[in-house]
Amino acid sequence: NGPLMMRLAKDAPRATVAWRATGRSERVTQQLHAIMCTPFIEDGHIYGVCSYGQFRCLKAATGERIWDSFKPVTGAEGRWANAFLVKHEDRFFIHNEKGDLIIAKLSPKGYEEISRANLIEPTNFARGRKLVWSHPAFANKSIYLRNDKEVRCYSLAAD
């Protein structure tokens, strides 16, 4: 159970364990228990959402936690809290379960929020909170989002 990093052989269908999760539970862990969010790996670091809503940065080679923050996800601990990450140029689009689109820079130095806008109402419920758990689509300089009631499109063009 829990996260682990596999090292794949280049010359054969073989893998070895690079590191495994440490900690007493999913709540008390140093790594990344990514339940719904697909983590993003860049420049030797992993960015993603842990199962209690902690947005984290880890060293990919060792699993060492560099930093974490609840700010981009729900602002506080929340079981199965979620956000989706999409890289765009030098920043990330982060769509959280509150319906916010966040533009941020992620680095081993930390989470730097550039802007945030609420784009769609959370219409579903889980663990006592309203949420939207659908991944947005990006095309033609626009973002497309949906909840259980509607589909919305917003231009992301710089003009």
Pin down the residues of each PLM region.
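Noncatalytic, solvent-exposed loop/strand surfaces
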Residues: 1-159
